Amino acid sequence: PFINFFDGFRTSHEIQKIETWDYEDLKDMADMDAIAEFRNRALNPNHPCQRGSAQNPDIFFQAREACNPYYDALPAVVQEYMDKVNEKIGTDYKLFNYYGAADAEHIIVAMGSVNDTIEETIDYLMAAGKKVGVVKVRLYRPFCAQALIDAIPDTVKQISVLDRTKEPGALGEPLYLDVVAALRDSKFSDVKIFTGRYGLGSKDTTPAQIVAVYENTEKEKFTIGIVD
């Protein structure tokens, strides 16, 4: 099972135009027999079963490591189903979607509804000749480093990662740390990577703030949206 998530209260309580998918288009992509089998394994007093096991220290570590191949294979499975959806309803979902100039020099990496604002800002900046872009994260876990690398234009010189969370005491926020780790040994190892926070508590993120992110070339750690 996967957790499909969005940005919380603000997104779930706004009035917005949406496009719905016809279930007739999607039902062929779902293995209903597998879903029924999964549901039948649910805990039920009418057909009780025992779950879980106690593992001693001599085997627990091995059991935890044994699941690695399944997580390693998962991004390709997700992309396969994204391709099926794309073919069926005309979307263009990838693990990481890029939007912006093909020769961008400064890009943002972000996930969630802020990407709508970023895209509008990119259109404005590109019309003025700016070389900017954004990588939209579609699959966060498992994090596929190669898919991220493939989505970034070779011309990039600076990356600003936006996180909508704060991890007190940590060296950085989760998405930023993932991007740094993914690019460390790649062709982008010399690219400057900045980190910023935005939108906590449903604070507005405006196009002007996104412009400020693209114009920032000095402050490696920053916030946007706080005006006190």
For each predicted feature, which ranges?
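Peripheral docking tails and interdomain loops at the edges
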Residues: 158-228
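Redox- and metal-dependent alpha/beta enzyme cores, enriched for Fe-S-associated oxidoreductases
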Residues: 103-130, 143-150
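Glycine-rich beta-alpha junction loops
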Residues: 6-13, 33, 112-114, 166, ...
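A general structural motif
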Residues: 77-93, 110-118, 138-145
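Short, solvent-exposed amphipathic alpha-helical segments in soluble enzyme
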Residues: 19-22, 120-129, 149-153, 176-178, ...
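Short acidic, glycine/serine/threonine-rich loops at helix termini
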Residues: 13-20, 119-121, 147, 170-174, ...
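Generic beta-strand/beta-sheet core signal
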Residues: 5-7, 109-112, 135-138, 161-164, ...
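Conformationally flexible catalytic loops at phosphate/diphosphate-handling active centers
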Residues: 2-98
